[in-house]
Amino acid sequence: DQPADVSVGGIVVLRLRHAGQRLQTAQQRATLAFNVLQNELMFAINQKASYDPKRIQVAKRLDNVVILAGGQTVCVITDEDAKGNRSSAFELAQRWAENIRKGILQNVADADSGLT
């Protein structure tokens, strides 16, 4: 199973891997993450300068590290994700969350200046 990239407005923000035995493929995970991030991006563009990038959060749910966008789960960081990025799950989630924030803010700035 090949890794699957997830973009926010054309900016790649994370790369998901297969979630393990009998779980979702990388592409299935990427599709779910993309849908949540599209909704967050539309919300951010509507909010413009008042958008709070702190809506993108890293949290612990049960024994998992997750990334949230406006309270919605973007993705669960799997062992495969962490190993593939030579990182701990928490460090990887922090990095991806920052990528998502930057991607959203860049798209908001572009939309505000008429570049999109």
Predicted regions and their residues:
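N-terminal targeting peptides and non-cytosolic leader segments immediately upstream
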Residues: 1-116
